[in-house]
Amino acid sequence: MNINVADLLNGNYILLLFVVLSLGLCLGKLRLGPVQLGNSIGVLVVSLLLGQQHFSINTEALSLGFMLFIFCVGVEAGPNFFSIFFRDGKNYFMLALVMVGSAMLLALGLGKLFGWGIGLTAGMLAGSMTSTPVLVGAGDTLRNTASLGGQLGVEQDHLSLGYALTYLVGLVSLIFGARYLPKLQHQDLPTSAQQIARERGLDVDSQRKVYLPVIRAYRVGPELVDWAAGKNLRELGIYRQTGCYIERIRRNGILANPDGDAVLQIGDEIALVGYPDAHSRLNSNFRDGKEVFDRNLLDMRIVTEEIVVKNHNAVGKRLSQLKLTDHGCFLNRIVRSQIEMPLDDNVVLNKGDVLQVSGDARRVKSIAERIGFISIHSQVTDLLAFCAFFVIGVMVGLITIQFSNFTFGIGNAAGLLFAGIMLGFLRANHPTFGYIPQGALNMVKEFGLMVFMAGVGLSAGSTINSSLGEVGIQMLASGLIVSLVPVVICFLFGAYVLKMNRALLFGAMMGARTCAPAMEIISDTARSNIPALGYAGTYAIANVLLTLAGSLIVVIWPELPG
């Protein structure tokens, strides 16, 4: 039996889509030196190559893909988005605005200078900023721009072409910029990180390997009683001195949970909970020949839970003010906007932060009720909320606003982004509403993006050869300019206008570019994860601004001369 692969793929959109995705994801795993191509560019390259062979796909798949992606971007940004405006995020918002605004203005100027259409210009902006939200926002607005008429298909093809040509330029140039730009300024990042650590009482080396706490039991002897000198547990402050706390005491055969007024006596058997290294550092008064193995004494359920910060008595407070250890709980990590924060007592908590806390199940539940709620451990998505807010986003996107003779449609991108932000925000404030496991959210977002990339690549592939020779060199040079010049402008603005600490500034700049690989380089250069504070500050707002920039550049293009 002979199988014509070309006919098979042309006759089956679903098969063609997943062939493109499979080949593109394989290509995306390749590395060029320290730079990995990535899934989006891999799928785009494969789809462009197959598009040259006149393979095509149903455009509805393209629309559904971008809608899922942009909605999930909003859901991720929602928990921390509003805190950018209402707390101390003014500097971060301004940095993100300067980064995105300067890049958009440069792209508009270069597009007019070289006589490109809006498709190439918007695609170049998206690729140079390595930002799929720009691409998605521009693509959606193009489809809703009636004035393009017969040029719509050409501009959509040029959009993906501009993105494909400049994506690697944007990624590689930003990575090199992150590596070498800190060396060109007067303050080195390690010194800046240490400075902000001293000012805020942070630990510059607050990255550590996390272990779960363990429970071990010891018999109290004369040495330990002498060391305690008659003080009760509250006065002794055993946790401050040892890193462990006393969870249980067996005295005269009776097992009890001690309060702060308990005084140690000879013959007591005490259960200590702490990290393994804390047990190893215990004074010899505790452990030399005195460890006991008692099933009942050691029978305690240590759990690890993710607690979402929600309550007003925790939001805006320093971590030390929660007094987790006084309640017998251990903090393993802090996550904000999917970014791990410095693990330090002086980190200020935002609504939506996730604290990973270990300890006795009762104690962890008690502390969770004080500061927020325990994140649901279910793997079941609240599909009702997901679908309902998706519908709301589409309906909002249908709204049009008219100024004189100019009509502006909000569009699906902005509408779905708004609906996603609201769903994410409500989820951060109501533990049983709108739950979406992070793995499920990542999968839907990534799949939607890959479907969108496959669609635009197959659509644009047939015209790539004729367009590449006309704009290739100009496009690459413009991509380099749009990638690096806004970074320099943002640095000057942050350093000399906002007078920000350099470690926080460089982290915030990488957040404004939503580029995790460049952020890793900044952290390595600073020998600290303190720049993550700046990255988390700009990341959520930058995703929103980049989507709006993609739509805005298409809207204002016809109004510009030239």
Swiss-Prot record:
Keyword Amino-acid biosynthesis: no
RCK C-terminal domain residues: 202-288, 290-373
Single GO BP term: potassium ion transport
The keyword Coiled coil belongs to this UniProt entry's keyword annotation: no
Bilayer topology term: Multi-pass membrane protein
Transmembrane segments: 8-28, 32-52, 66-86, 93-113, 116-136, 158-178, 383-403, 406-426, 447-467, 478-498, 537-557
InterPro entries recorded: AAE_transporter (IPR050144), RCK_C (IPR006037), RCK_C_sf (IPR036721), Transp_YbjL_put (IPR023017), YidE_YbjL (IPR006512)
PROSITE patterns assigned to the protein according to its UniProt record, in alphabetical order: RCK_C
GO CC annotations, alphabetized: plasma membrane
Compartment list: Cell membrane
Superkingdom in the source lineage: Bacteria
Keywords for the protein's UniProt record, in alphabetical order: Cell membrane, Membrane, Repeat, Transmembrane, Transmembrane helix, Transport
Annotated GO MF terms: monoatomic cation transmembrane transporter activity
A Pfam family assignment: Asp-Al_Ex
Family, as annotated: Belongs to the AAE transporter (TC 2.A.81) family. YbjL subfamily.
Name the record gives this protein: Putative transport protein ECA2683
Source organism phylogeny: Bacteria, Pseudomonadati, Pseudomonadota, Gammaproteobacteria, Enterobacterales
